[in-house]
């Protein structure tokens, strides 16, 4: 929607290898697109951002709000174990547990800022061409955080967004990490119309941080549900109820690498560094 920049969107490349991703980023940087697009920030590609003798890598498999399905936790832990076992030239890797700042609050803020008009324009555009809302769009619009803001309410929501960013930066700096490893979703590739939580990526959209996702592993028959699962909240219970290894066996899983804003080089170089993990 034109003019709706409470949460800015960008187009991310989809490539078949870390080297092709790096090539794309270099080409876009060398093209100096900021000379032609007033909404693009000046940023020269600088791999030196990654040139450290020691890299502190934060991680979490669970955001503390919605519990991932068992194969996701297994995949993240496997990925971390392989990092520990690999020998890297010229760099020492230190893995550091990280607790994300206020994930439930982040989901509330970004859910409201996706549709600051309460979804009015989206519904009107779909109606004008005879299209109906998909199940995923219905879930997003029916979120209790979605409302039509007046200008004072929008300013307040922007202040909440900015306060979240300040507090997250404080936690990140206090942890002393260079980058972070997390799940992309708290589940595998999902059945159409069933995904009701995307906070593991939306969190970083709200933060305006850089991330790259990489496929890793898939659901196995041995990834059994947690017995006597005790949900933290209603959403946690609903999410966990979606899972069974019979339904998801073979479905792909993904890991994401995250770095602060304008540090794309860090995640691309890390992806290259970890490219032997499979």
Task: Locate predicted features.
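Serine-dependent amide/ester hydrolase catalytic core
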Residues: 61-68, 120-231
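Preference for well-ordered, secondary-structure-rich cores of eukaryotic proteins
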Residues: 26, 52-57, 108-118, 126, ...
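Structural helix-boundary/capping segments
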Residues: 1-60, 77, 82-84, 145-148, ...
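Amphipathic alpha-helical segments in well-structured domains
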Residues: 73-77, 115, 119, 197-201, ...
């Amino acid at each position: 929607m034109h003019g709706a920049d409470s949460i800015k969107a960008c187009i991310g490349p989809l490539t078949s290898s870390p080297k092709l991703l790096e090539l794309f980023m270099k080409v876009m940087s060398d093209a100096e697109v900021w000379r032609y697009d007033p909404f693009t920030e000046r940023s020269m590609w600088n791999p030196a951002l990654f040139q450290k003798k020691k890299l502190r890598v934060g991680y979490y498999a669970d955001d503390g709000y919605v519990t991932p399905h068992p194969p996701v936790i297994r995949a993240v832990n496997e990925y971390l174990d392989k990092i520990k076992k690999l020998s890297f030239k010229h760099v020492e890797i230190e893995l550091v547990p990280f607790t994300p700042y206020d994930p439930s609050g982040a989901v509330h803020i970004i859910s409201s800022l996706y549709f600051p008009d309460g979804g009015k324009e989206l519904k009107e555009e779909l109606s004008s061409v005879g299209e109906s809302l998909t199940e995923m769009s219905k879930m997003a619009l029916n979120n209790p955080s979605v409302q039509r803001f007046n200008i004072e309410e929008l300013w307040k929501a922007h202040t909440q967004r900015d306060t979240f960013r300040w507090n997250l930066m404080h936690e990140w700096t206090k942890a002393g990490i260079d980058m972070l490893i997390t799940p992309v979703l708290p589940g595998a590739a999902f059945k159409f119309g069933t995904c009701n939580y995307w906070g593991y990526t939306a969190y970083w959209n709200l933060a305006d941080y850089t991330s790259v996702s990489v496929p890793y592993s898939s659901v196995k028959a041995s990834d059994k549900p947690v017995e006597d699962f005790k949900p933290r909240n209603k959403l946690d219970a609903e999410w966990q109820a979606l899972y069974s290894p019979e339904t998801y066996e073979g479905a792909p899983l993904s890991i994401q690498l995250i770095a602060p804003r304008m540090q794309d080089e860090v995640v691309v170089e890390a992806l290259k560094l970890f490219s032997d993990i499979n």
